[in-house]
Amino acid sequence: MRPLLLLAPLGWLLLAEAKGDAKPEDNLLVLTVATKETEGFRRFKRSAQFFNYKIQALGLGEDWNVEKGTSAGGGQKVRLLKKALEKHADKEDLVILFTDSYDVLFASGPRELLKKFRQARSQVVFSAEELIYPDRRLETKYPVVSDGKRFLGSGGFIGYAPNLSKLVAEWEGQDSDSDQLFYTRIFLDPEKREQINITLDHRCRIFQNLDGALDEVVLKFEMGHVRARNLAYDTLPVLIHGNGPTKLQLNYLGNYIPRFWTFETGCTVCDEGLRSLKGIGDEALPTVLVGVFIEQPTPFVSLFFQRLLRLHYPQKHMRLFIHNHEQHHKAQVEEFLAEHGSEYQSVKLVGPEVRMANADARNMGADLCRQDRSCTYYFSVDADVALTEPSSLRLLIQQNKNVIAPLMTRHGRLWSNFWGALSADGYYARSEDYVDIVQGRRVGVWNVPYISNIYLIKGSALRGELQSPDLFHHSKLDPDMAFCANVRQQDVFMFLTNRHTLGHLLSLDSYRTTHLHNDLWEVFSNPEDWKEKYIHQNYTKALAGKLVETPCPDVYWFPIFTEVACDELVEEMEHFGQWSLGDNKDNRIQGGYENVPTIDIHMNQIGFEREWHKFLLEYIAPMTEKLYPGYYTRAQFDLAFVVRYKPDEQPSLMPHHDASTFTINIALNRVGVDYEGGGCRFLRYNCSIRAPRKGWTLMHPGRLTHYHEGLPTTRGTRYIAVSFVDP
């Protein structure tokens, strides 16, 4: 009898091979249920097309007859499958894969699928799960499994058409009944299980259900390929199912599988389905509603509006909605609208006097676009976003996603405007790829669970899946998290792109509103924005040696400050108002005696000493080392101050040596406009600089060689900023 026992399985294998002689695409049909084309369904189709699967979607256009979020349901899938199988019931060679679609993707092709199906040595193979559902009382009836997952999962199964017809033949339930329970009861009936020849994919060789198995599944990269690997069983599943609460993990895996992103190829799908704006005239561009949100005291608001104006997009196709919650920024907003509001198609301002809550304002902005069918896009931008790339809006539109955000990070930090994963309670969790995405080691368009600060939404999405007028409320969540939770709940994907550097996030942690011009104090927290606002645009040319003049021996003259920097420093000093008396007695300095007194205010009097030292280190020290080769400075100073010269107050300054190794002297206003006269004369060289340029600095040696005097100011008021460096 032993030879006969050996021949039986061999005969079955020969039969199975005979059934599989045709090409995989000829004897395999994939059936799925999709009542509407969601983004999840389109992802499923894309992964299927990648491997050339034949797909037939059942139920498109039907209502889904189960309330969303309820645990029961799925009977509608059985009804649709039963009807679809009627024309295939006698096709013995036809293998049918039935699977969910919204939360499923393929990781491999038909040939591997059929090979693993045959190796299972059953006519029907169901996916297996770690958790029993929906009736835990049935646990004891399940066959014991020594290695692998024990419980049936109805989200995916494969079998020969006649066997599947037998499987669903007894279905007479309602659409709202549980398909999982229906299939479970058949499987747990030993007679039916044997008759239909059903087994489970215990070791996840074909199907990987993620619920209860998140720790088992990792990405496996290998020479331009990427798969999901089950660590527990060392298998490479063909289908990945984000069942239950694991859809976000499927989104993460779907950023890579199947071969959408690898280390060798980078992103292979980022240029699919783009909306090209090339060759489209301004008059044909889509209308964009820009929502601007100033929800807390924020540095560089004036710079924010300048960047908005620099966008390469016609204002006549842009509408503005501005919510300013802060009285502190009221003047800046009103100044911008007074100068540029008429350039936009329309403007709506909700100011601090209205006292509108953050979430309500954001709902209002989105609804303005939703209610206007001519609004093609809604572009939401918070004031703490530094949008430095003028092509930002066009680049986001071209990516052609329902919801997309550009990557924004804080300077020198991993803090960004997206999360790669969520914790069990719905808050931040770091995904495996988060750091690589933030630091640009992985570049692409990523499906993520959370975005904030800046994003573009299609108007059609706001009038469709996101039509709820209350997107920014959800339980007790903050508006940003509420928005993302509501978007996820509607099965709309949120994408993040780091294909281009469009800007960065400001740091608000140390921003103070106690000064007249608070941005001056942001050199540490937001150095790039501080540089853009306050450092002369030609400073880099000077650093390259292309814009440095030598009006007198060893005296160098180059641009350093913008007009705004000069004006704000002067205004800050006048606002402080505690000018010295210009006599020798001076309690502000060590010893209390000033040999060469001026009417001035020291940087430390306005709490600006630390920031001034940072400025010297970052911008003056590099020039010093270039202009005085061999000399290296740490930019130490005892005295840094702004001097005021007036004809009736202190018009000039007596000849003197500075108590420094070198001195910088920055002109803060304009000769011939703000004052007449003034300048500096170096006596030893009989050399004078009589027309200082606003924003330019003189740099010269201090003690010993460069004996100099301040020439008389004959009209108006002259201001200079002086530092005695390395005393």
Swiss-Prot record:
Annotated residues for binding of Fe cation: 656, 658, 708
Keywords: Dioxygenase, Endoplasmic reticulum, Glycoprotein, Iron, Membrane, Metal-binding, Oxidoreductase, Signal, Vitamin C
GO biological process, alphabetically ordered: peptidyl-lysine hydroxylation
InterPro entries: Collagen_mod_GT25, IPNS-like_FE2OG_OXY, Nucleotide-diphossugar_trans, Oxoglu/Fe-dep_dioxygenase_dom, Pro_4_hyd_alph, Procol_lys_dOase
Gene3D superfamilies on file: q2cbj1_9rhob like domain
Signal sequence region: 1-18
Matching PROSITE patterns: FE2OG_OXY, LYS_HYDROXYLASE
Residues modified by glycosylation: 163, 197, 538, 686
GO CC annotations, alphabetized: rough endoplasmic reticulum membrane
Protein task: Part of a complex composed of PLOD1, P3H3 and P3H4 that catalyzes hydroxylation of lysine residues in collagen alpha chains and is required for normal assembly and cross-linkling of collagen fibrils. Forms hydroxylysine residues in -Xaa-Lys-Gly- sequences in collagens. These hydroxylysines serve as sites of attachment for carbohydrate units and are essential for the stability of the intermolecular collagen cross-links.
Subunit structure: Homodimer. Identified in a complex with P3H3 and P3H4.
Protein name in the entry: Procollagen-lysine,2-oxoglutarate 5-dioxygenase 1
Gene expressing this chain: PLOD1
